[in-house]
Amino acid sequence: MEVTLERNLGDKPLRIQTGKLAKQASGSVVVSYGETITLVTVVGSQELRPGIDFVPLSVEYQEKVYAAGRIPGNYFRREIGRPSEKETLTARLIDRPIRPLFPKTWRYETQVIATVLSMDQENDPDMLSMVGASAALCISDLPFFTPIACVRVGRIDGELVANPTISQQENCDLNIIVAGSRDGVVMVEGGGQFISEEEMLDAIYFGQESLEPLLEMQEELMEKAGVPKRSADPVEKDEYLAAKVAELADPEIKKALEINDKLERQDAIRDVKKTVMEGLGEEYEDRGKEVSEFIHDRTRVIMRAMVLDEGRRIGGRRFDEVRPITCEVGILPRTHGSALFTRGETQSLGILTLGSSGDEQRVETLYGDETRPFMLHYNFPPYSVREVKRISGPSRRDIGHGGLSTRAIKEVLPSKEDFDYTIRIVSEILESNGSSSMATVCSASLALMDGGVPITNPVSGIAMGLMAEGDKIVVLSDILGDEDHMGDMDFKVAGTKDGITSVQMDIKISSLTREIMEKALAQARVGRLHILEKMLTTISESREEMSPYAPKVFTIQIHPDKIRDIIGPGGKVIRAIQAETGTRVDVDDSGLVKVSAVNLEEGEAALQMIKDITAVPEVGAVYEGTVVKIMDFGAFVAILPGTEGLCHISQLDTKHVKKVSDVVKEGEKIKVKVLELTKDGKIRLSRKALLEEENGKSGPENGAPQRDKNRH
């Protein structure tokens, strides 16, 4: 049955249609807003996946280039290879609010695919894909019962706007995505230009209020679809074994949770299993996996009870206490800037590299090709958490953490007019026990200052947690990995002393009240400023001088008509300049030439070559040129690269010249003076004028040839 529903969102209608496309999927919807259209499908396998202890959900987001009326620019002219950064980040946005809503015992492979079919350059398909994913799940036979809606919130000239267009987003000083259900907000992602905590709260709850029509549509769709829902296979629990494990494990778990050191604590928890297995005897020696699951469950219960009932955290920290912090800068001598930020057992090494405009990242998107002068890359090697894994390209998590940190830092970067460099920061996570993305923000900020990049303000970040059961609610600052894993919220906040630049929030409970979120943001501000103070004791402002190994950038403006002279046939000339001087030369369509060099001498040498190539002859100027061709009537002399003029036979010498070759030879270097630039582009030269000047004589006006007195 074909069903189409429509509600106004912002200044235009949003439509959800089902029953027309992809009807063999478990659920499929087409979401339209303006002329942007996405197809979202969901399929749940009919076969149980045994031997796993997690929900096997995968989410894919695909931006088809045809949606924007374009052909892919790669060799194959089709979409190939890994998803783009935008596709990866959007897939994570879709995944995060829906994953917690599946039954914890769901063990059937489930795949959500969002495909952008049409893009109008004004309405971003990411929000449509998030709404579509929830709608497709709601009308499917999968056990997904809670509609989730999503809206982008922007602020333009102080006014909050729901779903600003792409062009409007350029004028927003706040830009966040809010996802929520009937119960409340479940996810927040975005940032802004130094936003206060109260302003951020207002934006989040403005977004929550804007979700109402989208939730109504999905509820109506569910009712009209009327598809019976499958149930998750219940996991049979051996209550006797669970009780026995609790009896044997609880005392040892409590002791382990008193250990502050992460690795020692993990080893102690691992030893708990050995103790329990010995206590259970041979009868249960083949039930090790179940025992491990029961121990994990008891660890969660005991740790949460420590916090909620006893008011204690792992290692004895206060709820609002930040772990010890150390900062170092300039630790890598050949890089352009470096910093080591350590907070407890989380450590990030930030490395700054500066480049020319030619080093900017070029990205093909549905909006067209764009360049990015700032990049921040996050790496999480397995040794950082004492694991052994295959090293491959960046994971979705790596890309997501990099995106979060990028938002935090980019607001404090100087403009291209003030600092004409491409900036790349790499964060190497050397060890991790919670909040490595916020450690990345701190190390990146320190590395920028160490490298002499004139940022407006340093940025720090903190991860907040939550544990809530009934009326018992505790907000935790600077959470550990265990507190994140066994807690109810992961709320990352980054910013300067003047306000927030980046936020990311995910919760595992049904919703948060405004009061809890307000407390979390206020507590986060105190923690952020504490971390910032520690950073500033190491380096208080950007260095006045950049690293001697950083490139020097020189610029020169040339006439656009001269661009082809610098490039040369097939790039021959520009490659020769770069090879001879050891520099990098970039030219844009306006004729702005940028030379990137390691030292001053190389840069000036390249600039001089460019000036010589693009120089325009001036009347009265003297040039040392090379005779390139001899004719009966004179000699052609190359006075500049690609520029030749004629020195007439009468202008070769002060005395009468019978034969040109008697005075000059091909390949000979001679000095000549420019007499005239004719309207048809020809250049008249004179050697004779210079000889007369050397002899103290003045030739005829304008260098006109003299009549031979012996001729009648």
Curated annotation (Swiss-Prot):
Residues 689-712 are annotated as: Disordered. GO terms for cellular component: cytosol. Its EC number is 2.7.7.8. One of its GO terms (biological process) is RNA processing. Pfam families: KH_1, PNPase, RNase_PH, RNase_PH_C, S1. Its cofactor is Mg(2+). InterPro entries: ExoRNase_PH_dom1, ExoRNase_PH_dom2, ExoRNase_PH_dom2_sf, KH_dom, KH_dom_type_1, KH_dom_type_1_sf, NA-bd_OB-fold, PNPase. Its main location: cytoplasm. Residues 551-610 form the KH domain. Keywords: Cytoplasm, Magnesium, Metal-binding, Nucleotidyltransferase, RNA-binding, Transferase. Residues 620-688 form the S1 motif domain. It is found in: Cytoplasm. Gene3D superfamilies: GHMP Kinase, N-terminal domain, K Homology domain, type 1, Nucleic acid-binding proteins. Involved in mRNA degradation. Catalyzes the phosphorolysis of single-stranded polyribonucleotides processively in the 3'- to 5'-direction. Belongs to the polyribonucleotide nucleotidyltransferase family. PANTHER family: POLYRIBONUCLEOTIDE NUCLEOTIDYLTRANSFERASE, POLYRIBONUCLEOTIDE NUCLEOTIDYLTRANSFERASE 1, MITOCHONDRIAL. HAMAP family: PNPase. This is Polyribonucleotide nucleotidyltransferase. It comes from Desulfatibacillum aliphaticivorans.
